[in-house]
Amino acid sequence: MMNWEYMTILEDNMEKKNTAVVTVVGNDTVGIIARVSAVLAQHEANILDISQTVLSGMFNMIMIVDISLSAFAQLSDSLTALGNEMGLQIRIQRSEIFDAMHRI
């Protein structure tokens, strides 16, 4: 008989292997969410959660995306190129890496 707590942790870890965290920071301009979303859609990444705010003209956004159908390296390159084009810092990290880096 399996421990339910263990099963929950295992399922969470399995889900995280297919998710990534996208962060966007830069001067607020029209169309940031639309353009980032378009790149994600082109790479078949599904947005699971999104939070954005603008503080003193600075745009900040974090997205959780399902990358099960995406080629991670190509998606990362496309987001970096979009960031360079728009003057934004756009980063994508696999969820398990993001969690490990931000664990206290």
Protein language model features and the residues they cover:
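A conserved regulatory-domain signal marking ACT and ACT-like small-molecule sensing domains
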Residues: 2-104
